[in-house]
Swiss-Prot record:
Residues 1-72 form a transit peptide. This is Iron-sulfur cluster assembly factor IBA57 homolog, mitochondrial. The keyword Mitochondrion applies. GO terms for cellular component: mitochondrial matrix. The keyword Disulfide bond does not apply. It comes from Neurospora crassa (strain ATCC 24698 / 74-OR23-1A / CBS 708.71 / DSM 1257 / FGSC 987).
């Protein structure tokens, strides 16, 4: 017996013309099994520089949950780190769900649901790691209690998520297509709220009469992940480890994911205390892997840094050695010198780049606020093992790691320092006006 088929409309990125494609019908249960089997997100080859500078990709690594009803906003406000009622968050915002101890459970982006049956009426879409979407759905359902809202884990056949970016001067081939899709009321594009100029999220209503965007001729999703890695943007529970990661170490504060002035929410106490009384000594940073010789030269800060970094990309660190081979959580240590505690932990990568949780004053030249320079030395090399245990007969292969602070994060720190200095100056002036001593 031939499998049942259905006809869908397909649009290519260079033209809005529709063509017909045929896909086999697959039940929801089988789709769920397929998603669990397809956990590998990255291709084995590094994308071209053109892909990294402009593109449109379908985010199969992300999934959407619908929350709608009279108590939707009130409920979410009490369980997320950001302020759902802030005017600047009206188009969508980055945030997280924490444990009571202040550890990250899920990092998410929340959008107003303008494409649903009741647009604008207390209806939201929560974007989350696809592998953990069912877990978050159960988490919300467990704490819903008597709150009045509907909760639904959306199938990709209902709503699809795309990401577009364009770092070149002229309009990209996808710009017109996205505009047409939005004008037809089938999609909504919003700037990614985490890092300026990272790109835009495009939420597409797949249940419309024609599917406005399809998989044909799209940029590989690996290009999107490479851009994230080079910019130091962690995403999902493979990089922001659930129940372990701290929000500030995961850059959620500098990626506009935390409102430090909002009311109570789950996990607030430790987060606020760390912000106002502590020092963030570790952060997730982008890393370049290399094997022999001097560390790669990191391009100068500024918007052109990303384009320059693309020239350092390789499909392998060396023949047969890739970032994908490094175990998650592998310790990054100084060459020929064991530290009391490893200054870094590997998270995830592709080709010769990736993300790691790094001690700032050891692995970079960052000077922490109110402290003297750390132990960083530009001549010091760091290594990470590809696996294996200490003392085993076969020593695990090691590759060198060069961590760096991306330009946008330095800009955030500079602005924060200027703001802190201005506040200090104003406090001193106020004390002088009142005839009080300034220490």
């Amino acid at each position: 017996m031939q499998p049942a088929t259905r006809s869908i409309a397909v649009a290519g990125p260079a033209s809005a013309a529709l063509r017909t494609a045929t896909t086999p019908f697959i039940c929801l249960g089988c789709r769920s099994v397929q998603r669990k089997q397809q956990r590998r997100l990255f291709s084995s080859t590094v994308s071209t520089q053109t892909d990294l500078r402009a593109g449109l990709t379908k985010l199969t690594s992300r999934r959407l949950i619908s929350v709608s009803g009279p108590d939707a906003s009130k409920f979410l406000q009490g369980v997320i780190t950001n302020n759902i009622n802030a005017p600047h968050n009206a188009n969508g915002f980055y945030t997280g769900f924490l444990t009571a101890q202040g550890r990250v459970v899920h990092d998410v982006i929340i959008y107003p649901d303008d494409l649903g049956p009741e647009p604008g009426k207390q209806s939201f879409l929560i974007e989350v790691d696809a592998d953990e979407a069912a877990t978050l759905h159960k988490h919300i359902k467990r704490y819903k209690l008597r709150s009045k809202f509907n909760l639904k884990l959306l199938d990709p056949e209902e709503r699809a998520l795309y990401h577009s970016w364009n770092d070149v001067d002229q309009a990209g081939p996808w710009t017109k297509l996205i505009d047409e899709v939005q004008n037809a009321g089938n999609a909504r594009a919003v700037p990614d709220p985490r890092v300026p100029a990272f790109g835009s999220r495009v939420v597409v209503n797949q249940t419309s009469s024609s599917s406005p965007l399809t998989d044909g001729d799209l940029t590989p999703e690996s290009s999107y992940h490479l851009r994230r890695f080079l910019l130091g943007i962690p995403e999902g529970q493979s990089e922001i480890i659930s129940g372990t990661a701290l929000p500030l170490e995961s850059n959620m504060d500098v990626m506009n994911g935390i409102d430090f002035r909002k009311g109570c929410y789950v996990g607030q106490e430790l987060t606020i205390r760390t912000k106002h009384r502590g020092v963030v000594r570790k952060r997730i940073l982008p890393c370049i892997l290399y094997y022999e010789g001097a560390a790669p030269e990191i391009p100068a800060d500024g918007p052109g840094q990303l384009e320059a970094l693309e020239k350092l990309l390789k499909p392998e660190v060396e023949q047969g050695v890739k970032a994908e081979m490094i175990p998650q959580g592998a310790s990054i240590d100084k060459v020929d010198k064991k530290s009391r505690s490893a200054p870094g932990k590997w998270l995830r990568g592709i080709g010769n780049v990736g993300l790691a949780l790094c001690r700032l004053e050891v692995m970079t030249d960052t000077v922490l606020p109110g402290e003297t320079p750390g132990t960083y030395s530009p001549e010091q090399d760091f290594v990470v093992s590809l696996g294996g245990e200490e003392g085993s007969e076969v020593e695990a292969k090691k590759v060198k790691v060069k961590a760096f602070v991306p330009f946008w994060l330095k800009d955030v720190w500079r602005i924060e320092a200027e703001k802190a200095e201005e506040e200090r100056r104003m406090r001193e002036e106020l004390l002088r006006d009142r005839g009080l001593d300034v220490e």
